[in-house]
Amino acid sequence: MKKERLEQAAAFGKERAKKKKNTDTTSNLVPVPKGAKKEKKRVGRGPGSKVGKTAGRGSKGQYARNTVRRGFEGGQMPIHRRLPKRGFTAKFHKEFYPVNLRDIEKSGLTGNIDAKIMVQSKILDKETTLFKILGTGEIKKAIHVIADGFSQSAKEKIEKAGGSIKLRAEIELAASETKK
């Protein structure tokens, strides 16, 4: 009987050890080795600390007392004031996403190509994105492109292949006039 109870207790102890999940407790953590954690240097705390008195700032003067503002050049006229103002920021500037002819050729697009088709073929992210067709690459098949802009070389290459070009703004303008 006693032997059985001892076996049961041993089995129960094993089960209990299995159930124990987290072994990292504050009682069994080992301290980190010396030098593994760099301590912050405390300055200005007396001569025994090696960084007392002037606290690593040298002796007296402007830089020992405080910092100087960004762009300060010691009283000399700073560069942002020496250089003249130039140009202006356009109020209604439009950013065009560049699409090269090689991108159209690589995606295998043919026939009528507009923003919706470009989004489906993952050349553009959104239909509302303004995009300009540029002439890098060659086009072999005739394509009819509706875009927000064309470079001169792209126009020539598309028309040489037997295709046509139209500006999206002109089409939208014509559509709005027909509604009136």
UniProtKB/Swiss-Prot annotation:
Gene3D superfamilies assigned: 3.100.10.10
Keyword rRNA-binding: yes
Molecular function (Gene Ontology), one example: structural constituent of ribosome
Sequence intervals crossing the membrane: none
UniProt record, GO biological process: translation
Basic residues: bias regions: 35-44
Subunit note: Part of the 50S ribosomal subunit.
Function noted in UniProt: Binds to the 23S rRNA.
Family: Belongs to the universal ribosomal protein uL15 family.
Name used for this protein in its record: Large ribosomal subunit protein uL15
Organism: Leptospira borgpetersenii serovar Hardjo-bovis (strain JB197)
